[in-house]
Amino acid sequence: MKITKIEKKKRLYLIELDNDDSLYVTEDTIVRFMLSKDKVLDNDQLEDMKHFAQLSYGKNLALYFLSFQQRSNKQVADYLRKHEIEEHIIPDIITQLQEEQWIDDTKLADTYIRQNQLNGDKGPQVLKQKLLQKGIASHDIDPILSQTDFSQLAQKVSQKLFDKYQEKLPPKALKDKITQALLTKGFSYDLAKRSLNHLNFDQDNQEIEDLLDKELDKQYRKLSRKYDGYTLKQKLYQALYRKGYNSDDINCKLRNYL
């Protein structure tokens, strides 16, 4: 087969053959196989050229994808599939990128966890799930997590939550709120509980009473649209008790309120 035309098309070159076949190749392919118009190729040379062209094009795509941020092996492989790189070529591209240190799942996991320590608010369980979703294996994640101390981060997150809700909730409800939030963010129950030790949950009686008054007004506006009489009183009691207020304080308020 003879090359009848070589035409540059943006990042690729269009190669046309005298058997009406055509294909796109990278500049690396042109150089490697010394392609030029009227060059004759046998079947083996053509197949080698096609394989290398796919490999070269796929690698260029991967490098473009990696230019924005670190990616896992799986993320790069999925990106190549999306751009229709042949499946049997993808492992070769991944291997080359690993050898040239463009991708490294262990390093990615380490960077992700360290960045979270500096600027994030996630505990180890959520971090592991997010890294698993990126296709990083547990054996690359677990050693890094086990060597990372999350106690300071848990304290920072708990302090932020404390500052946010301190003037809105009574002590018991505030503790429960912070604990549940930390669990949701992936911290262990033990770490969530220990992070509360540096917080001051003391509130004087007047502060608690003011909070109770505000919450009672809020719940009354909401529940009085549907209920009245004894049922309304029951619903108000239940709502306030769930918020963490003392049973005696609630009953006292309800007697004077209704």
From Swiss-Prot:
Its main location: cytoplasm. PANTHER family: REGULATORY PROTEIN RECX FAMILY PROTEIN. The keyword Phosphoprotein does not apply. Keywords: Cytoplasm. It comes from Streptococcus pyogenes serotype M5 (strain Manfredo). Belongs to the RecX family. Disulfide bonds: none annotated. Modulates RecA activity. One of its GO terms (cellular component) is cytoplasm. It comes from the Bacteria. InterPro entries: RecX_HTH_1st, RecX_HTH_2nd, RecX_HTH_3rd, Regulatory_RecX, WH-like_DNA-bd_sf. The keyword Cytoplasm applies. It is found in: Cytoplasm. The gene is recX. One of its GO terms (biological process) is regulation of DNA repair. This is Regulatory protein RecX.
